[in-house]
């Protein structure tokens, strides 16, 4: 009985271990598949290659040109070629980035007419929107005219109309009732504050004020004259020889 229970316990433990190993393998392989899919994503790669240091016969001999093009037509039937004889380069344009990547991996540094073929990916041409997003944008000129006035008004600026002047008609009416020589109490005084009284002047022009209150003139002091006796008498100089 004890032997049977031990055998059953060992069988259960082995089943548990096998299931754990299977789950771990599934998790590992599942993660590896996701990583492989991410690594095999070739959508960002360019679809063109540049072949550098190409043999001169490719540009001059039609048979060598056909032989060179046959190397790349295996990967893509719709491939096109652009020959730059002065630079000894050929641009190979594929229809898919996968074909360009395979040709780059398999044909790079292979011998062609006694020379190693150098293959490089062409630079990806960015559109206008992506090119603008790759650089830091200047701030929006919404409130820059508040810092310094611009040469021309900003977009959407409209000149505001002048506000109508505020006229206090009650004040004008009170001033018109004032007469010369009289005083008017505006605010009555209290125990802690004095009263405010307005005295109206009798004269209305400055000329009348000057005639009634003439300005005091300051007489300048006369300069003293030199004595006449000192100027009239001749001076004698004694000279002994």
From Swiss-Prot:
Q: Which portions of the sequence form the region Disordered? A: 1-22, 201-241
In this chain, composition skew of type Polar residues spans 1-17
Q: Report which superkingdom the organism of origin falls in.
A: Eukaryota
Location of region: Calcineurin-binding: 183-203
Q: Name one GO cellular component term.
A: nucleus
Q: Which Pfam families match?
A: Calcipressin
Q: Fetch the SUPFAM superfamilies from UniProt.
A: RNA-binding domain, RBD
The GO terms describing molecular function are:
calcium-dependent protein serine/threonine phosphatase regulator activity; nucleic acid binding; phosphatase binding; troponin I binding
Annotated GO biological process = calcium-mediated signaling
What quaternary arrangement does the UniProt entry report?
Answer: Interacts with protein phosphatase PPP3CA/calcineurin A.
Tell me which family the UniProt entry assigns to this protein: Belongs to the RCAN family.
Report the function annotation for this chain.
Inhibits calcineurin-dependent transcriptional responses by binding to the catalytic domain of calcineurin A. Could play a role during central nervous system development.
* Name of protein: Calcipressin-3
* The species this protein was found in: Bos taurus
UniProt lists the gene as RCAN3
